[in-house]
Amino acid sequence: MNLTPRTLAACLLSCAMTTAWSADKIKVGFLATASGGPTTGPSKDVRAGFDLAIKQLGGKLGGLPVEVVAGDDQASPDVGKQAFDRMVKRDKIDVVTGVVASGVIYAIAPQAAQQQVFFVNSNVGPRDFVADKCNAFYFNTGWHIESVNEALGKYLATLGLKKIFVIAAGVPVGREHIEAFKRTYGAPLAGEIYYKPQTLDFSAELAQIRAAKPDAVYAFAFGPLSANFVKQYAQAGLKDIPLFGPAPLADEDSIPAGGDAMIGVTTAGHWNFDLAHDTNKKFVAAFQKEYGKDATLASEQGYTTAMALDAAVKAVGGKIEDKQAFRKALENVSFEAPRGPFKFNVDHSPVQNIYLRKVFKSDKGDLVNRTQKMIAAGHSVRGASSCSM
């Protein structure tokens, strides 16, 4: 009999031992990038948001004391797998979270299912673990590539932009962004480019964009590459062509680095600092008080991850050894996060609002990402119902 990762996870879960007693604590493996590279900054922010929530919860999740076991994945799939394996075998973790590097996410999700450890992905989620590829031990409290990009593609189609040029890194996650965007945008593209990872000089790509004379450009980049691309975009005289993308193109790290070139860049995401509801206002104020700096998208994701775990542990009365009960409790969490209403779909992908944000210069001269509107309410991935867990 050949077992797929999904069927293996379901089998292991159904066979998991349960007990009638509660654990005395919950061990959370926090696997992140601490040794440099573009995922180091977001990793620190996810941890800061997670730690803030734990502090507000009195050092507990659902009433259980929390022990956080930290690990450095070095943004390497192989290193990440080794670090995760140590956490499971040596530290006996119950949950792993914190991963930002997409390659590490791909690497440890099947491993977590095999070892019956819940992987709560607090960052961007790929197609490989949702819909008909769902995994009993995999949950995503961050955002999903398809959800955000499909919402943006559908919105831009309503603006009458007939010729959009798309550009992204030539890696699986970059191609997945583009495919999701194209699926709902629908119209023929003005052009499509995949640049080499860690590209520093975009002159050749920008020349192709200029020659195509598009109505707008969709770009996926993150970290230092975002600021680098946007600055060169402006320097190439393309500033009059509207620039769109998912949240990492213009976030709390890339906007200061990009400077005035970032003005006008419009992105789609599931959170922004200026969302007006009380939960977000309290989160933003608490983060500023705790760390002396502004909250970020990544920090909100860490915060929401902790709150989801808190709700699930509370629902099972601390009996986290009952893996099936704990899984069902996670599946049923529903609460008001800083981003707005949050819950999981049947395939454990997030169901949440998607917002349009645009960079402006304030009266004080600061660059700010202002929410323009909600472009999708209670949005999730396509085909979630095909999950057969």
PLM regions with names:
Residues M1-A9:
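Bacterial N-terminal signal peptides that target proteins for export
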Residues G29-D51, G71-D78, V100-A101, I167-R175, ...:
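Extracytoplasmic "Venus flytrap"
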Residues K25, G41-V46, Q56, K60-F129, ...:
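Beta-alpha junction/loop-to-helix N-cap segments that form part of ligand/metal-binding clefts
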